[in-house]
Amino acid sequence: MTQTENLTAAAPPAASPVRVAIAGATGYAGQELVRLLARHPHARLTMATGSQATSAPRKLPALARIFDGEVVPLDLKAVGQAADVVFLALPEAASADVAPVLLAAGARIIDLSGAFRLRDHAARAKWYPATKALPAGVVYGLTEFAAAEIAGASLVSCPGCYPTASLLALQPLARAGLLRRDADVIVDAKSGVSGAGKAPSERTHFCENHGSVAAYGLFGHRHTPEIAQALDCDVTFTPHLVPLDRGILSTIYARLAPGTSAAQVGEAMETAHAQSPFVRLTGDALPEIKHVAWSNFCDIGWRVDEASGRIIMVSAIDNLLKGAAGQAVQNFNLLIGADERTGLL
């Protein structure tokens, strides 16, 4: 049975649309959330806010006729009263403060920041010092590997964009025991400039970025411990900024367990993603960013060198959709009992 043939539909959600709000609706990921949720058949977008209580009210011209409401200042009491599910597209320090308040008000949370991704206290203190503790009921929301947990979660912590592209490729092999303990995993990733956020900087300035490719965050990127946490092994991760508006291409190198064949790798990937509607396994046909841009798909290809026991994998996603807003809506669908494809195809 092929990957596509094996997909099954989820139970239908409740008849009434779920009230949703977005905090941080003016950033790149936030605006994608507005676009997706304003047209979602099982969601009623009741409020979209800025990232601060002092944010000036504003419209979103790019979303005219899709969402003609106003993005208002962040008022936690009003958000808690207006929504049953709240999407947080805020900086991690703001999410760390806001989420407990909204949880106490009875809302379920889907958080796009890194505030609640790391389980280890020491790692969290190093990379996300604003997060003092993980709220009860938090689930790491890599959709393809946590569907049951997400359905019952009070807080879904969506993975980062780079970890999403990396783990959808590597986790099937790790779970099948096909990676060596000392797998020497290397992730070499290229991202469009929207991954750096909307705040202007020299690094994302047109004159600096256009016609160039630059590495950054060597041995110092907060997505490294997130990838390593899921794989339970050391990871070397190097991101690069490329002159594209959106998209991530990750080239991944690893050592396979002794005796692992190319056929075993293919079987592990097919088995792991048989029920993954947004993962497209391309095998020898290597993915490209242009094939996934403006979609919620993750394309994964690979080559195995059985003689050396090494594998090279290539994965591609749209960083703002599968790496952020699209994955968040996919998790929302699971949260409300809808088919996870709803509003994304």
Feature names for model-found ranges:
Residues 253-345:
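C-terminal active-site/capping subdomain that shapes the small-molecule cofactor and substrate pocket
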Residues 246-250:
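Conserved glycine-rich beta-strand-loop-beta hairpin in the small C-terminal domain of fold type I
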Residues 26, 95, 162, 166, ...:
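Generic structural signal for well-ordered, non-membrane alpha-helical segments
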Residues 242-245, 271:
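Aromatic-enriched alpha-helical interface/lid elements that frame and gate functional surfaces
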Residues 38-42, 175-179, 221, 229-233, ...:
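Generic secondary-structure signature for well-ordered alpha-helical cores
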